[in-house]
Amino acid sequence: MMRKFDSGPSVKSYNKLQNWFDFSKTGFIRVYSGKVDIGQHISSTLALIASKIVNINYEQVEIIRLDTDFTPNEGITASSLSVANSGSAIKAASITLKTNFINYALNQLNINEEDIQFENGVIKDKNSNKSISYWDYSETDHYKNTIIPEQFDEEVLKKVSYANNQKIELKNIKEIVTGKYKYVHDINFPNMLHARIVRPHLYNCELIKINEDFKKRLIENNIDLFVKGSFVAILSQDEFLAVKFSELAKNQIVWNENRKLSNDNVFNSLNANEKESLLVKPGGEAVNEKIPEIQSFEHEGIATLSSEFRKNYLMHGPIGPSASCAIYSNNKFTVYSHSQSNFALKQSISSYFNIDTSMVNIKFMPGSGCYGHNGADDVAFEASVLSKAYPDCHILLKWTRQDEHCWEPYGSASINKLFGAINDKGQIVYWSNEAFSDTYFSRPSNEELNNFTSFKFLNNDFTKIRSKPKTSAHMGIHRNLDPLYNFSKTRLVKNLVHDLPLRTSALRTLGAFANITSSESFLNDLAFAKNIDPFKIRINHLDDERAIEVLENLENTMKKSHAKPNNYRGIGFSRYKNSAAYCAVGVELNISDDLDIKLITAWITVDAGEIAYEDGIKAQVEGGFIQAASWTLYEEVLFDSKEIISKDWDSYKIIGFDNIPTFATNVIDRKGYPYLGVGEVVAGPTGGAISNALRDALGQRIKTMPFTKENITSELLN
């Protein structure tokens, strides 16, 4: 059977070679993409895809940073879709470029294909030494009018041979490790103003007054005070003074506290608060249908289990706080941002100022890297507001560490309630998983400008906005609630819980981390009930051969060694969104008498389709493992009725270098298959593997993350 290649959704909107390539720099191919570098080095992978197909050195390919004035709009850099969408588009454009260029050159040089020499973008006639290059070709109408097909058949693909698994140097890596790389925080323009926001201690505080003597002191020091509604900023050409006086201002302002945070235990609130419940169908779509009761079983030989798993609030915690630079000049905003969602940001800013979108240009400039909706959009919006008040002047606004920890939208706390039934043949005949959570979708938009945290302060409107449940397949709370496994009967329910205390939005994997961790833990508990091997119960409930191969590869790898005395092992598996890459994780850990958990070894097997860049895949899954391990073992946002307590790294614990395991990572190559997103695939399996290894160690399931001494002790005693 012929294997075809689909160009992906981006080509449907941008089907000209000119949408993807720029040949204005002699000797280099510059490639456009609508995806951005947020720590995953996607630009290196995209450059490699182009270079190996168009037959030019990797060093001669440059990825043009996103600019909303001219780069393709490929949506948010999220949901593990960068290589799947932008990578596929660039692959399609590269195939189209190469095949059309060869045909054009053969015609222009009047030679046969066996007579050409093709190196570094130049085709030469072996006999006459006449030549033509990509740069020559890019000037022709033939190039300018060429359309990228939406699909390629096998005959075309056979003509485009290329190698995989090349070793490359990441773009800009030398500058990054030597400190020469410029982030948005490092921007410096003549006469630029540095800004800091002065915030209250809590979300819903209205400005009452600012000390008049303090205002005079600001004037004496040539420092600007910007106030609109309850939005307060300090600005100075001297960054040190902006920082100093913004700190002093905190004690010079009187706020009215409109509403405290809920003092109740968040898990009590998740159970008790008003909620909207939707049934999740096989395939992952959520529908507004009657929720069936959990089925009862009284059949002989059927074992039933129920369990409840809990996850606390998590923060993004980027190593550098959010920042943005903006200027308003000639009736146009130019904003430098490290947001993942720059085209939506452009729309939102234009909507706030009631101007045409053409009057807002967002230029991506890297920050410290973050997966999800952190403070990047908020700070860009705030910088644009300040720039309007100071026309023709660049405003560089940096959040503080406390800003980032206390004002970013978190990943929601959640509960998963599971019930299952397994018969004597080891078949799971019934599976129920019910998820309870706040929203994972509160990105700002034209219609929801109040999702900018400062929009509320600018307008003194602290009305609590209720989110609406998302219904598309594997969206938000119910991402990966529908398992890949074949269970005889399933009951899957998402509950969007209202009036929870903290601001929440998209954090890496959305609800999938909690859903997969709880499912993989509960699956092991059902296996133990019938004394079934954890690998066997998973494989026996799968008919996807690629999923089975991933699990078998992990099993064979782990069998090459045995757990050392007092070490314990666990596994986890999923296919992210049931449509992205497949991933199986094994963990070996040790737990001390003091309940300190030490990660020893992590085995990871991943199938991401055709390998775009193997080292990049390994870096993504190993880095994703570390982040998920940190969530599982350490991280939780602490708060009380008055404030967020987790203001810094002392009060928000993360994994340290002393608990990074040894990695053994296998990437299965499926050359000719579609690229599958890999950025988020490892998180859920990691949580499941650690949970299962901990159960192996303790003989009891710990059901509240993070698995701290306090949570372990509490559950063991109860």
Question: Which residues does each PLM region occupy?
Answer:
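Cofactor-binding beta-sheet edge motifs in enzyme active sites
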Residues: 1-718
